[in-house]
Structures are given as structure tokens and as C-alpha cells.
């Protein structure tokens, strides 16, 4: 489904999906206030430069999965070596909503990826 705004996207989510998305947005706003939240490809994203090709991190949620999207396939492959039981796409890592540990792991990996790309924290 395609959404035209972040508020429209968030209002379409169920409780758990909304919780995870809002937690991630809060994390990014508090730890990386210089990165501007964008709504692109029907998901919240933070670009590391003026254009998406400069690198990005984003998140999306479905009824069964929360997904971290990054601009590096090699970074996703590195995560896969560490946690092969998670679900992987070309530039994304997905978790179910079953454990808090998995969400905290994705938060950690997002922080690491952002820090590598913007040189902070």
C-alpha cells in the first residue's frame, strides 16, 4: 500500500507496529537530531546527505514484521553472519514482534550503521 504522508502511514498501523515505528523515530530524533526525517518509499527514512544515494537508514512495519532498511548490502550480509535466524532481503533485516531483544539488536545495528556513515557517536 502506498501512503502520501508519515501520519497517514502511522495511522494505518496496528498497535505493535506503531509502537516499534515510533520508538525508532524517537531514537533517531534524540540521538541524531541533525538527520532529517523524510517520508520516502512509503516509510520513515533518514538520508545521510542531500540525496538517497548518499546513504540512508529507514524502517517499515507490517502485521508480522518490523524491518530495518539500510543503503549497504554488505552491512546486511555482516548482520546476517551475526544473527542468521533473522529474515533478510537485499538491503534489509526483518524481525518478528516476539522479543524485545530482537528490536534492541536492530536499534544497535542502526546506531552502528548511522555512526559509520556520519561519523558521530
Task: Tell what function each PLM region has.
Residues 1-121:
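Charge-dense, helix-prone N-terminal extensions
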Amino acid at each position: 500500500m502506498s501512503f502520501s504522508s508519515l501520519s497517514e502511514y502511522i495511522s494505518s498501523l496496528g498497535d505493535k507496529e506503531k509502537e516499534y515505528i515510533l520508538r525508532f523515530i524517537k531514537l533517531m530524533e534524540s540521538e541524531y537530531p541533525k538527520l532529517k526525517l523524510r517520508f520516502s518509499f512509503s516509510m520513515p527514512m533518514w538520508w545521510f546527505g542531500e540525496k538517497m544515494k548518499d546513504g540512508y537508514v529507514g524502517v517499515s512495519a507490517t502485521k508480522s514484521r518490523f524491518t530495518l532498511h539500510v543503503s549497504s548490502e554488505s552491512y546486511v550480509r555482516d548482520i546476517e553472519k551475526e544473527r542468521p535466524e533473522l529474515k533478510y532481503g537485499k538491503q534489509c533485516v526483518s524481525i518478528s514482534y516476539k522479543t524485545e531483544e530482537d528490536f534492541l539488536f536492530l536499534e544497535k545495528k542502526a546506531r552502528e550503521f548511522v555512526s559509520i556513515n556520519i561519523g558521530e557517536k
